[in-house]
Structure formats: structure tokens, C-alpha cells
Amino acid sequence: MIQSTEFFWWKFELVFPPDVEESFLWFLNMAGIKSYAIERSPDNLQDQTLMVWLPSHEWLKKDREEFENSLLALNKAFREDVLNTKWEKIIDEDWSSSWKKFWKADPVGSKILILPSWLELPDIYSNRIVIKLDPGSAFGTGSHPTTRLCLEDLERNPPLGKKVVDIGCGSGVLGIAAIKLGAKEVRAIDIDSLAVRATSENIVLNNLSQKQLSVSLGSIENLANQLNPLSADLLICNTLSPVIKELAPYFFKLTHSYSRLCLSGLLVAQVEDITNFLSILGWELIDSYSSDNWALIRLCRNHP
């Protein structure tokens, strides 16, 4: 019997809420999958669509079922929603351009533009500060509400001439933005080697030097020992509330009397609790901002 040698792609679609985006992107990168895109509708901020293109000869039925079940299980760890999924057979589509066409130039605030690395700068955004990112590297392109809150805060409070520390750097977008908004230097750190690799790649994409933005693999304790006695003027940490609580005892060691904290990854409902927790450690709330049930808080040391 002659077996078919037809080559095609499986296109997988999954509608999901924004708060699990970074977990999904982490999973895709761990699986070595780079041909994916996320489609967002301005009319529905609560749902977005993940699209993944998989070569048929590498992804048999059992592999596709395992792939889908893994994503659904990952979502269930965060919330109970049943996600809508779809598989489609794509024969004539050029996947190398198909997944890329869904990524667009993404304006943030009034000054910043997130630009996928393969796109030309649109004339309409020629006056913006451009941050080039590779969506296929890891951790997305700064589209999560908490990342946008941090970018907007950096724009409101540009770190001119300041030393910045980015704890849990992900793609490196916040450190890159800090440099492009005038920071003297940024030290970024993450416990995930994928994040360190992604940040390193994005540093190169943006023509920055290691002297301007350096990234290392390790814990906040490692960084505190490396930086001492060099203190940061601004400490950025975009992660979950329980993680912030674990890291908070090190914030004093990384900063000085007039430093500022920029903390996000928090739900609006968690702001009061985390603010009270940090107050006990000597930090005072300056401002808070919110978007789509997510929040950012800015703090300074509580001087008697």
C-alpha cells in the first residue's frame, strides 16, 4: 500500500483569558514551539485567541491530544473556565508568514511602541520610543495588563540617570524600556533560564550593551550580594503577590533611602493586603493604578 506523503500544518486555536497568557507562552517555549500568535479583539478584552501552527509529520494524533490537554490543565490550575479549542488542517498556507501576520506594532501609553522584530516601523509611530521584541523567544511582547502598567509607569516617571533593578525580567521589555527612557543602567535577573536567554536576545535586537543592561540567572539573594553596596534608585518587580511577599525582605538591601519600588502582577483586590504587608517592612504607598482588574503600586521608604 502506498502511504500519503502529503505535507501540511495543523493550526490549533484556543480562546483564553489574559491572566494565563504568560503561563501559556512559557509552556510553548518549553515545548520548543515558536510558530504561534495571539489575536486580541479591542471589543472583548476578556478573551483572546492563541493560534499555533504544528507540522503534521511531527505532531501525530496522540501528540496533539497531549498538547491540548496540557494547555487545558495549565489553565485549570488558574481558573475553572472551560476553554474553547479548534484544530484545522492547513495545506497551502505558508506558515512562516502566517503566524507572523497576527503580530502588530503595539503602542503603549503616549510614547512607547512594542515592535515585533521583523516589522518595519510604521510612519504613524515614527515619533515613539521603539522597543523591538521577538514574540517567539519567550514570555510574549509586553501585552499583559501588568506589563503595560509597568511600561506606562516608566513613561510617567522616566528613570533619567537612575540605576534600575528588574526582578523577574521575563522578556526584558521593562529593562529595555527603562534604558530607552533614560536610565543609566539596568540590572535584570530571573530564576528561569528561558527568560535570561530571551532578555539577552532582546538586548541585542535593541542595540543595547551589557554595560547598559545586564541580565543574570539567579535569585534576588544572589543579586543583593552582587549589588552590595551599589543600591538601585528604582526596583521593578512584576510578579504575583505571594512571590512579592517572599522577595520583599530583600528590597531594603537592594535600595537606598530615596529609592522607589514599582510593583505589579497584583490583582486590584490584593492591593490593600500587599500594601499593609510592605508597610510593616518600612514601605509607604505613593500611587496605585489599575487595568482589567490588575494593579500596580509605587512605594517609597517610610521615613519617620
Swiss-Prot record:
S-adenosyl-L-methionine binds at residues 147, 168, 190, 238. It is found in: Cytoplasm. Keywords: Cytoplasm, Methyltransferase, S-adenosyl-L-methionine, Transferase. GO terms for biological process: methylation. CDD domains: AdoMet_MTases (cd02440). InterPro entries: Ribosomal_L11_MeTrfase_PrmA (IPR050078), Ribosomal_PrmA_MeTrfase (IPR004498), SAM-dependent_MTases_sf (IPR029063). It comes from the Bacteria. Transmembrane segments: none annotated. The keyword Cytoplasm applies. The keyword Metal-binding does not apply. One of its GO terms (cellular component) is cytoplasm. It is an enzyme of class 2 (transferase). One of its GO terms (molecular function) is protein-lysine N-methyltransferase activity. It catalyses: L-lysyl-[protein] + 3 S-adenosyl-L-methionine = N(6),N(6),N(6)-trimethyl-L-lysyl-[protein] + 3 S-adenosyl-L-homocysteine + 3 H(+). Its EC number is 2.1.1.-. SUPFAM superfamilies: S-adenosyl-L-methionine-dependent methyltransferases. Gene3D superfamilies: Vaccinia Virus protein VP39 (3.40.50.150). Belongs to the methyltransferase superfamily. PrmA family. Methylates ribosomal protein L11. NCBIfam families: prmA (TIGR00406). HAMAP family: Methyltr_PrmA. This is Ribosomal protein L11 methyltransferase.
